[in-house]
């Protein structure tokens, strides 16, 4: 029996769910009856992608009483059936690991080290606005779970996304047991084990006790014991795992961690009901997992690469090609990414078939919940969770989700699309003829469709490159005798993309490098230089080149109030000083609550926006005074670092998210005559006119780790932000991922500048302006627009060749040139 109670917790109204057991186990799937429909629903579509039984062309689906009743080219629908049309229908998509509707409680309120009795279903906030964001993107089911601070942080809940909060959202109250290996290391010393050895010993002992407890209960039930064991809530929570009613969802990253989880699962009988969360390094164990029912739930990092790996490893492709069921996860909490289908497009872009991409977004997630008999595919008898689209389910150039049905009820209906413009046509393409080699210093390309960025498009164009620069860009034209010529066959040529800001190191999975972005000995350190925080041998630089990134502005992080100088580098090479093109490129500062709260915790005193601004202003005042001093004054490293900013030789990048922070950044820049670029900028769209009046640029993002971090999300964020800002005359660009020895820059959605541009396009930014956000805008913000960012005579020959429009999810560069040298060639 499920009761819904309302309560007020000194804040917004929340729905909290309490389960009362009346003769049934909490592990039972909750079936809330769907109100009998007075009308059947008939859905007609050009294509119905069933996932499990192929594609039905010009098909129909009959829905009644919340279930799929018939599927085919012609169904027996009653005359009064309510009809809907769509170009394409797919099953509702499933996020197999998220935190929406919950806080990440295990790091704060859930005591360690092992608390399986904690119930997510009793801690739900079903009015979380991120539920509606997920729904609008076609996500119909989610596993909501607590965080990863302890060995087991309790029981996850499977939810259905609904437009109105209520008990029908509970798909399965106890869907899996959340466990975690690696994230607990160095967390809660004295409360949780600090080694994987301690993890195994602790988990093993609890499961041993639970197995004994179950035997005692069975002995009493069967009359072999006179007394039942004393009720133990913690051990009771493990019994559904041992009995096979729920999955175990274990966070495990390294192969050794995965092997340890497998050993525990074999010993206690849940090896066939095991999901491996994140599992970024599962690839050495693929042969071991093949043929089992273990389900890796990959993400948010989905592609990895290590030094000397010839190519990035698409984990989903490796797993699926080996016959292993694998799903994906967003790991979102206070944010949720609307365009869940973009994960599929991203994976298809890098090796999956469209069908495989659809499987990881639907049926495989259902299998990770042990609910594939109800959701995840379009089959007779299953829940009518359906997504109706006006184009291909992986097309990223528009918000394709028109309607979402859940349990046969229309839960979401899109209004007018944000983007009404069509992309310019490209193609058809004829075969490439002749070629250019990496040692050719001068060459020509003919028959190209050039997106100059600065001056429109040129069809049937000829490009001449000499000594690393463009010397001719024109329609038609002749080619000088004696130089190599590549006939492009109508292919698109555009400038290489530029990452406007990235940190020196991406800490994901590497404890050494997670402390390399911020010098946290004190809050004001302008003398720092990102040049010395980088290892150019990290494979991420090469991967960036392969996807068309030709320049990156590498900066310190965002923990310091003043963090130091950035540096612009070209992506190819191993000698970092040879890669440098602008040093310094920028000075970074931060006014965000994350920065102030960090220093408040470190100092034990209150640090507010006002006091942070005062500290920054004090340093600026001292630097101004220093700049006016005697030329023979005593050298001050800190003040010297500030001089290029004061002279307007480089911009100041001030990290500011909220309205008050952004206004203070504008005030600082105005008072000291600084050239301002606002980074982070979650609420910048609310101040578009003020930012434009300040002649400031905006770099959207709080890191390069996740698409949601780059594009915003959560409170105060708007997907229309880039359109609002650009309409006001503000230059917009994007953060990108930092370097890493293992986390590929294309490993997580959002790592490719061009995908951020297409996101801006489908949310209302004109095509050419969206392309500028990944090319010319960052170049101009960083004072390198005279060298890169567009295809113009005299500029560096940094460009890519594409067999299709750059916003087509299937199109990656076939050729990448940097400084006129061929760096990438895909055959």
State what each model feature region is.
Residues 105-106, 114-118, 247, 298-302, ...:
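His/Asp/Glu-enriched, well-ordered alpha-helical/loop segment
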Residues 135-273, 400-401, 406, 413-414, ...:
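Polyanionic/metal-chelating signatures
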Residues 46, 61, 66, 86, ...:
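Divalent metal-coordination and catalytic microenvironments
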Residues 18-29:
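Bacterial N-terminal signal peptides
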Residues 48, 52-90, 454-496:
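Histidine-rich, glycine-flanked metal-binding segment
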Residues 46-49, 379-422, 780, 792-827:
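C-terminal cap of metal-dependent C-N hydrolases
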Residues 1-15:
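N-terminal secretory signal peptides that target proteins for export/translocation
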């Amino acid at each position: 029996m499920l009761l819904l109670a309302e309560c007020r917790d000194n804040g917004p109204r929340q729905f909290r769910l309490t389960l009362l057991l009346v003769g049934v186990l909490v592990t039972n799937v909750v079936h809330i009856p769907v109100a009998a429909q007075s009308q059947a629903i008939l859905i007609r579509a050009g294509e119905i992608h069933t996932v499990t039984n192929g594609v039905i062309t010009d098909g129909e689906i009959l829905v009644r009483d919340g279930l799929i009743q018939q599927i085919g080219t012609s169904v027996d629908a009653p005359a009064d059936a309510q009809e809907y049309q769509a170009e394409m229908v797919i099953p509702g998509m499933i996020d197999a690991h998220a935190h929406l509707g919950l806080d990440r409680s295990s790091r704060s309120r859930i005591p360690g080290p092992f608390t399986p009795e904690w119930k997510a279903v009793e801690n739900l906030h079903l009015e979380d606005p991120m539920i509606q964001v997920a729904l609008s993107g076609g996500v119909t089911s989610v596993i909501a779970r607590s965080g990863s601070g302890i060995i087991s942080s309790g029981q996850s809940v499977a939810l259905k996304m609904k437009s109105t909060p209520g008990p029908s959202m509970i798909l399965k109250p106890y869907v899996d047991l959340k466990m975690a290996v690696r994230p607990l290391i160095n967390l809660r010393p004295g409360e949780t084990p600090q080694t994987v050895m301690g993890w195994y010993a602790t988990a093993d002992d609890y499961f041993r006790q639970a197995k004994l407890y179950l035997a005692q209960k069975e002995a009493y039930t069967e009359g072999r014991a006179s007394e039942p064991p004393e009720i133990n809530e913690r051990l009771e929570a493990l019994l559904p795992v041992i009995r096979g009613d729920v999955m175990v969802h274990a966070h495990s990253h390294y192969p050794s961690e995965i092997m340890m989880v497998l050993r525990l699962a074999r010993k206690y009988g849940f090896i066939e009901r095991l999901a491996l969360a994140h599992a970024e390094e599962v690839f050495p164990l693929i042969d071991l997992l093949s043929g089992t029912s273990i389900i890796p739930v990959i993400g948010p990092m989905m592609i990895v690469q290590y030094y000397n790996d010839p190519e990035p490893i698409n984990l989903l492709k490796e797993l699926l090609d080996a016959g292993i069921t694998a799903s994906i996860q967003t790991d979102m909490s206070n944010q949720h990414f609307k365009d869940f289908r973009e994960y599929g497009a991203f994976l298809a872009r890098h090796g999956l078939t469209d069908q495989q991409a659809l499987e990881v977004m639907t049926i495989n997630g259902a299998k990770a919940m042990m609910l594939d008999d109800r959701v995840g595919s379009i089959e007779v008898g299953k829940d009518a969770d359906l997504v109706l689209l006006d184009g291909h389910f992986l097309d990223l150039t528009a918000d394709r989700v028109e309607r979402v049905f859940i349990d046969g009820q229309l839960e979401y209906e899109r209004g007018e699309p944000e983007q009404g413009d069509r992309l310019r046509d490209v193609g058809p393409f004829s075969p490439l003829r002749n070629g250019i080699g990496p040692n050719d210093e001068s060459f020509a390309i003919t028959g190209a469709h050039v997106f100059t960025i600065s001056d429109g498009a040129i069809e049937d164009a000829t490009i001449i490159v000499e000594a690393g620069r463009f010397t001719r860009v024109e329609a038609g034209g002749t080619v000088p005798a004696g130089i190599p010529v590549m006939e492009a066959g109508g292919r698109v040529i555009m400038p290489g993309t530029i990452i406007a800001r990235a940190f020196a190191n991406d800490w994901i999975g590497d404890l050494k490098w997670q402390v390399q972005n911020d010098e946290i000995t004190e809050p004001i350190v302008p003398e720092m230089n990102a040049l010395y925080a980088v290892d150019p041998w990290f494979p991420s630089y090469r991967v960036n080149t392969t996807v068309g990134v030709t320049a990156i502005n590498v900066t310190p992080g965002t923990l310091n109030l003043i963090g130091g100088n950035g540096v612009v580098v070209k992506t190819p090479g191993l000698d970092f000083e040879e890669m440098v093109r602008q040093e310094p490129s920028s000075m970074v500062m931060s006014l965000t609550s994350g920065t102030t709260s960090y220093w408040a915790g470190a100092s034990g005193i209150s640090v507010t926006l006002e006091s942070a601004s005062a500290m920054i202003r004090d340093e600026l005042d001292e630097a101004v005074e220093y700049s006016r001093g005697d030329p023979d004054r005593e050298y001050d490293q800190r003040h010297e670092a500030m001089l290029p900013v004061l002279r307007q030789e480089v911009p100041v990048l001030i990290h500011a998210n909220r309205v008050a922070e952004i206004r203070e950044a504008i005030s600082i820049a105005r008072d000291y005559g600084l050239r301002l670029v606002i980074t982070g900028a979650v609420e910048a769209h609310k101040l578009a006119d003020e930012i434009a009046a300040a002649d400031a640029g905006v770099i959207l993002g709080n890191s390069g780790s996740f698409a949601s971090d780059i594009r915003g999300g959560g409170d105060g964020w708007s997907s229309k932000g880039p359109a609002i800002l650009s309409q006001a005359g503000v230059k917009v660009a994007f953060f990108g991922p930092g370097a890493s020895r293992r986390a590929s820059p294309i490993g997580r959605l959002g790592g490719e500048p061009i995908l951020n541009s297409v996101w801006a396009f489908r949310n209302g930014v004109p095509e050419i302006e969206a392309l500028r956000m990944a090319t010319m805008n960052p170049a101009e913000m960083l004072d390198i627009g005279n060298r890169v960012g567009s295809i113009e005579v005299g500029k560096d020959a940094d460009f890519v060749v594409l067999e299709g429009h750059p916003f087509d999810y299937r199109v990656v560069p076939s050729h990448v040139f940097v400084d006129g040298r061929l760096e990438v060639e895909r055959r």
